[in-house]
Amino acid sequence: MIKRVNKLVLGISLLFLVISITAGCDMGKEEEIKKSFEKTLSMYPIKNLEDLYDKEGYRDDQFDKNDKGTWIIGSEMATQNKGEALKVKGMVLYMNRNTRSAKGFYYVNAVKKDEDGRPQDNKIEYPVKMVDNKIIPTKDIKDGNIKKEIENFKFFAQYGTFKDLSKYKDGDISYNPEVPSYSAKYQLTNDDYNVKQLRKRYDIPTNKAPKLLLKGSGDLKGSSVGYKDIEFTFVEKKGENTFFTDSLHLEPSEDK
């Protein structure tokens, strides 16, 4: 009887030890993920995008020694009401630190599925450039609404803020060392500053508070290969979605 009790106690102790170690590993990985994103997100808000020409980013052996790199900044809003196409609007800008010039495109898309259930892309791109911190179309645009959307467009990095990532706690952590890929997901409230800013700028068809997802690939300590995105997920289910994505990272320039 005593042996059985001792075995039971030992088994319970080992179980608690495993749980403690697992929890500790998750907490450690969560802090690593936050630290990995913090290097870039701590720069937000960047009200004048031209400040990025003087901002250093992560560099590795993929960069030529004379290449200052190109910042790639993107923001995108996607909404899909039940039974409708996924409507996407966003912008990507390539900011070359060597030439101190920026070009990119504004885009709209309506993703539908064909009879076989395969998504059909209907993306339309409108080339743009940035001069004196203003986004300007480089070709004539007949659609007045699109022209106005481009003129009024602001990247999330210009108004979002992540000065204190430590306030986000107990996230849903995922890490795959084989890829490698990683993510941390947090439930937000509608009182969150960034959520208020998104609702102010976009017609978000739900009152549900979003989840914040920090997701990336590549070496957690830093890499020019891979990606780091942040996503605010308001609705995520079959045939109905609402989410906002943002990214900012430095890559080797095509023209050194």
UniProtKB/Swiss-Prot annotation:
Pfam families: DUF576 (PF04507). Transmembrane segments: none annotated. It is a lipid-anchor. One of its GO terms (cellular component) is plasma membrane. PROSITE patterns: PROKAR_LIPOPROTEIN. Its main location: membrane. A lipid is attached at C25 (N-palmitoyl cysteine). A lipid is attached at C25 (S-diacylglycerol cysteine). Belongs to the staphylococcal tandem lipoprotein family. This is Uncharacterized lipoprotein in plc 3'region. It comes from Staphylococcus aureus.
